[in-house]
C-alpha cells in the first residue's frame, strides 16, 4: 500500500528511461477555432500500471484522486435518453468535481464517451476557477484511432496537429475526443493475447485501488475505484466479470439500455439464471440482433459469476429514484461494496473516511452509525483529525455523539499537528510564521548555530508560537497557555508571565492530554475563522460567557491585521458578543446573585481573568449595556448605601461627616453577625449569601474578627467604624469628593492666576504654594494609577496601559505644562512666559472637567459625539486647506506681486482667506474705488503695500468662487458629517453611556476614598502597609474574586446548565422558523417519494414472482402433456426426460445444454 500525496518528481525519469519502458509521450493540437491542446502517451499493452499511474501524477501533474470513476458502456452511436444525458452531463461531472475524482473513459469520440466529453467541455467553459477542474482521462486502442500515423510520428517536444472531424468516425476507426485533455493510447499486443486495452485498464484500476490518498494530504484513505455501467453490449460481460473478481464495485444505471438493463433484471434472482431466461432478456434488450446458443450459454455463465457478487453491484433507477444526486449514489455503492458483516469498527473505517472526505454526513448517519457497531473513542481518532482539518463540523458533532471522547483525543501533540495543518493563505499561518522567525532570530543572536539558518521544508510550528500569538490577542487572559503542565509551573504562570530559559524550548510534554480540550479546540477554530465549528466547541465547553468574549477580542484584533476581511470578522465578532449577551441574559433571568458572581469570578480556563475584564478588552459595549451588568454596576456604585439616594443628602454628609450617623442616608440592612462554624460553612452556597457583591474571603474575615472587635471596642465602636467605611468607601462618595475638590482646585487656580500671581521676589504667595502642593498630590495619584495598580504586570505594560487612556494623556499634558510654567515663573527673565504657560495649562485642567459628565445619561454620549466630530474636523480641514492655500497664493500673486515681506505673505496667504470664510472681506484691497494706500518709501515699511489693479476683475471672480466652495459646499459638507456622527451616536446613546458609566465606576471604585489634596493621607497609609507587609484593603475583591473550589465548581455547573437551556431555546426557535419548516416539508416529500419508490420495487418483485410461477406452470404443463400422450415404456421414457428437463432447469446447470446435438435450444413453450 502506497501513499499518494501528489506528484512525485522521480517517477518516471527522463525521456530515455521512458523509451526503455516503451512510453512515447507527446502533445496534440486539435483543429478548429478553440485551439484545444491535449497530452497523450503511447504505451505497450504490457506496461506496468504503476509506471502509468506515476506518469499521470509526476509528468502530467494531475492532482491525486480521491475517487476514480471508470465509465463502461456502449462504444457505438446510440439514442440516449434525456435523463441519462442529464446524469452524465450534470451528475457525473458534479460528482467528480465535488469529490476530486478522475473519470476514466474511452478516448474516442463515439458512443458514451462522446457525451462525457461534451459534459467535461461544458463544465470547463462554465467554471470560473482554475483550481477546481474535472480530470477526464481517455484510454483507447491505437488501432482504432483515426489518423493514427500522425500520433505515431509525433515527437515529444513538438506538438502535432490533429484534424478534428465533424463525423468523429470512419468505419471502425474513430477520431480522438478533443474535449478531453489527457489520452492513453495502447499499442496492439501480440496476436492471440486478447484485447490489450481491456487488460491494461483492469490492471490500472486494480493498482489505483491499492494506493492511498486523502484530503489535506493525510494519505489515510484508500482510493476507491467505481465502475459505472451505462448501456453496453453483451461483450461487456467479460469485462464486468473480471472486474468483480478483483472486488471492483459497480453502479448499474437502470433504463440506460443494453447489458445494464439485463443485469438489473437478473441481479436479484440468480437462482433462476439459466440460458433460457438469459436468452429471453437478450432478445428483449437487443431485438435487432441474433445471438448463437453458444454465446447465450457463455454469457449465462458470466452472468452467474457476476450476480454471485451481489455486494459489489448497485442497481439504481434515476427515472424512479431521481431525488438523490449521483455523488450520493456513488458513495452508497462504495459503502455497500466495502461493507462487511463483521461488527468490528475497524472494518468500517475506510467507508467512514470516504464519507468524511466527501462531506456526506447523512450517509454516515444512515449507513455507518446506525447502531450496528459499538464505536470506541480510539477508533474515531483518525477520522476526527480528518474532520477537524477539512472543516467538517457536522462530522465532529457526529463522532462526539457516537463515542469520541475529546478529553482522551486531544493531546498537546495532536493540538500542535492541528496548528501545523493551517492553510498557507490564512492570517494565522502568517502570524505563526512571523513568531517562528522572531524566535529563530533571537536564538541566532544568542549564538545558537542551528538557529542561524532557516529550516528547510514547510514551517513546523510549535505550541510556543501559538501561545505567543494568543498573547498578542488576549494579553493576560491566556497567561500560561501551552507551557509546562506541572503544578508548580502552573501556579507561577497564574501569578506572572513565565520566563523561558535562554535558548531553550518550552518544557511541554506533547503526549500529555489537554487540560481544557474544548477551550483549545475553540481557540483553534476561532483563529482559523471557522465560525460553525467554533460555535459547536463553544457550546460543548465551559465558561461560555468568558469564551464568547475572548472570541470577540481575538476577532477584533485580527480584523485590524487583515483589513480586507474586516467586515466579515466584525459580523462574526458581533455574533459572539450576541452569544455572550444572550447566555448572560439566561443566567440573569435564572438567578441574579449567581449572575453577579459570574461577572466577577476569576475564570479558571482563562488565566484567572474575569468576564468584565474580557468584555473591557473586547470593547463589548452591548454586553455592558445589559440590564444585569448595569444592575451590578449600580450596586457597586452605591456600595452599602441605598440606590437612588438624593445628591443633596450625599453632599450634606460629605460637608458634615457627622450626618453619616443619622438617618439622613439609608444604608443596607446589616445582618446579625454569625461566627459559628456552620455559618462559615454556609458560605459555600451562593444562595445563602446576603449580597454577592463582596468577596467571600472578606466576609469570612469580618465574621472571624467580629468577636474581637466587639470585645475590644464594644458594639458602638463597631457601628461607628462600619458606618464610616460604608459611606467613604462607596464609589459614589469618592466621585462626589473628587468633583467637589476639583472645583475647589480650579477656583484656587483661577484666583492665583488672576489675582495673586506675583513676580519674584515677592512671589510666590501662600495660595500659590497651596496650589503647588495640590498639584503635587495630583502627580502622586497619577503615579499610583500608572505603576501601583496591578502587581502581576510589568512596569512597561502598566505604563502602556496608562498612556492608552485619553484622559490620562490629558493629565500628563496638564502636569507637564504646570511644571514648565512653574519653572519659568521662578525665573525673573521668563516670568511672563511662565504666566502664559500656566494660563494655557489652566485651560487644559478645565477641559479635564468634561470627564465628570460621563456619569450623566444625557451628557455622557455627547462626549463621544464631540470626540468623533473632532476626527471629522481633522479630515475636513484637509479639504479646506487645499482651497485655502490655492486661493491665498493666487490672490497674493495677483494683488501684491512685489511685496516680499514674510510676515505679510503669511498674513495674506493663510490668515486673510481664513477670515474671509467668516465674512471679513477686505474691500479696500479688492475694490479699486476704495483702495487707500501710499507708495511713499518711508510709509511702506510698516504699512501694507498698494495692491496691483492689473487683474482686479480676476481677483473678484476668485473671491466669489472661493466663498461659494468654502461657505456653501464645504461648510454644508461639515454639517452633514456632524449630523451623521450625531445620529450614529444618538442611535446608540444608551449603549455608549452605559459603557462610559462602567469605566467611570471602575475608575472611582479603585481610587482612594479621600480626594486631593487629602489623598496624601491615603497614599501614606498604602505606603506604610507595604513597608510593614501588611495586606492592604482589597477593594478589587468587589470586581475580581477567587471562589472556593466547591463553590466555583457549582457556579460553573450552573452556567453550563443555563447554556444548555439557552441552546435548547435557540434550537426551538430555529425549528419554528419558516426556512426550517420548508426544509422539513421538503424532507417529508422526499421521504414519501422514496416510499412510493419502495412500493414500485415491491410491485416489481411481485411481477417477478408471477413470472417465475408462470414459468413453473409452463414446465409442469409440459410434463403433464408428455405423460398424457402415451403409456407404457414410451410414457415412462418421456416422463423421465421431462423430469430431467425440469431438474436441469431448476439447478441452473449448463452441462445438459452443451451435449452433442443440443446446439439448438428447445422451442419456446
From Swiss-Prot:
Catalytic activity as recorded in UniProt: Na(+)(in) = Na(+)(out); K(+)(in) = K(+)(out)
Subcellular location field: Cell membrane
Biological process (GO), any one: positive regulation of insulin secretion involved in cellular response to glucose stimulus
Region Disordered, residue ranges: 481-505, 1126-1165
Coiled-coil segments on the chain, per record: 553-581
Annotated positions binding Ca(2+) 2: 782, 785, 808, 811, 1003
Pfam families: Ion_trans (PF00520), LSDAT_euk (PF18139), TRPM2 (PF25508)
Record field: compositional bias (Basic and acidic residues): 486-497
Family annotation (InterPro entries): Ion_trans_dom, TRPM, TRPM_SLOG
Modification after translation (UniProt): Ser-129 phosphorylation by PKC, is essential for activating TRPM5 via the G(q) pathway.
Free-text comment about domains: Contains two Ca(2+)-binding sites that are allosterically coupled. The binding site in the intracellular domain modulates the voltage dependence and the accessibility of Ca(2+) in the transmembrane domain.
Its job: Monovalent cation-selective ion channel activated by intracellular Ca(2+) in a voltage- and temperature-dependent manner. Mediates the transport of Na(+), K(+) and Cs(+) ions equally well. Activated directly by increase in intracellular Ca(2+), but is impermeable to it. The activation mechanism of TRPM5 involves a multistep process.
Record-given protein name: Transient receptor potential cation channel subfamily M member 5
Taxonomic lineage: Eukaryota, Metazoa, Chordata, Craniata, Vertebrata
Recorded name of the encoding gene: TRPM5
